Each structure stands twice: as structure tokens, then as C-alpha cells.
């Protein structure tokens, strides 16, 4: 279908795509650099907190169990992406593909049970093991 609309070599099409993508990115960065508000005395090494200076310097490491939950979400979200790809090719994969998918799900369920028993999913106030 692509040859009907634009008879072009696939390598040239890739080069055009990369060049246009890089040009769009450069244009967006250039427009942002021109239009941004320039402030005298702005410190680029301080975090942005709604336009005000930070209240106090950090007092040490922060307890942030959210990052653990986010990492677990990313790990187990990949399971869904892989299983969606398997579902598309389930007929061609046959019984072997079904068994492989079941083993994959089983390993991830074992990992989830291990994390649950280990207390990695307990992120409220309370005792951890």
C-alpha cells in the first residue's frame, strides 16, 4: 500500500522519518527556548516548587514506599504487555504456547506471593519483617 501512495525506497523512507522527527524535536526545543520566561538570578540547581524558594534543605533520606510500588507496577505491567502479544498469536502458538504462557504466569504469581510474604507490599504504618 505504501508503494502505491509514495514509491520510495524503505531506507530513504526511514531516513526521511528520522530527519523529520529530529527536526520536529529541534523546533519544539527552539520554540520553548525563545518563549520561556527569562528570570535574572534564577538558580537552576534548586527544585521548582510552584515558583517559590524551597522552604528548607532536605534533612536526609526520605521514606518513599511509593517508588517500590511503582517499580512493582512496572514489572507486573510488562506481564500484561507480553501476554497481549501472546494473545494475538495464541492460535498459531497452539498448546505449546499455552503451556509457555501458563508457566510465565505461574512464575510471576510465585514472585508476587514471595513479595507478599516478604512484606514488600505492606507500605502503611506498621511493622515490617
Curated annotation (Swiss-Prot):
Subunit text: NDH-1 is composed of 14 different subunits. Subunits NuoA, H, J, K, L, M, N constitute the membrane sector of the complex.
Keyword Repeat: no
Catalysed reactions listed for this entry: a quinone + NADH + 5 H(+)(in) = a quinol + NAD(+) + 4 H(+)(out)
One GO CC annotation: plasma membrane
Gene Ontology MF, one: quinone binding
Encoding gene per record: nuoA
Protein name: NADH-quinone oxidoreductase subunit A
Transmembrane segments: 14-34, 67-87, 97-117
Role according to the record: NDH-1 shuttles electrons from NADH, via FMN and iron-sulfur (Fe-S) centers, to quinones in the respiratory chain. The immediate electron acceptor for the enzyme in this species is believed to be ubiquinone. Couples the redox reaction to proton translocation (for every two electrons transferred, four hydrogen ions are translocated across the cytoplasmic membrane), and thus conserves the redox energy in a proton gradient.
InterPro entries given in the database record: NAD(P)H_OxRDtase_bac/plastid (IPR023043), NADH_UbQ/plastoQ_OxRdtase_su3 (IPR000440), NDAH_ubi_oxred_su3_sf (IPR038430)
Organism whose genome encodes this protein: Rhodopseudomonas palustris (strain BisB18)
Xref: Pfam families: Oxidored_q4 (PF00507)
Statement: the UniProt record of this protein carries the keyword Translocase: yes
EC annotation from Swiss-Prot or TrEMBL: 7.1.1.-
Annotated keywords: Cell inner membrane, Cell membrane, Membrane, NAD, Quinone, Translocase, Transmembrane, Transmembrane helix, Transport, Ubiquinone
Protein location: Cell inner membrane
Enzyme class per UniProt: translocase
Amino acid at each position: 500500500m505504501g508503494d502505491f501512495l509514495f514509491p520510495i525506497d524503505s531506507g530513504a523512507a526511514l531516513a526521511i522519518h528520522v530527519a523529520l522527527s529530529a527536526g520536529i524535536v529541534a523546533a519544539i526545543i527552539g520554540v520553548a527556548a525563545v518563549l520561556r520566561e527569562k528570570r535574572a538570578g534564577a538558580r537552576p540547581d534548586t527544585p521548582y516548587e510552584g515558583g517559590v524558594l524551597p522552604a528548607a534543605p532536605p534533612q536526609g533520606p526520605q521514606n518513599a514506599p511509593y517508588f517500590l510500588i511503582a517499580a512493582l507496577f512496572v514489572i507486573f505491567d510488562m506481564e500484561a504487555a507480553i501476554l497481549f502479544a501472546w494473545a494475538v498469536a495464541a492460535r498459531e502458538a497452539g498448546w505449546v504456547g499455552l503451556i509457555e504462557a501458563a508457566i510465565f504466569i505461574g512464575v510471576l504469581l510465585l514472585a508476587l506471593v514471595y513479595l507478599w510474604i516478604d512484606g514488600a507490599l505492606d507500605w502503611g504504618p506498621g511493622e515490617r519483617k
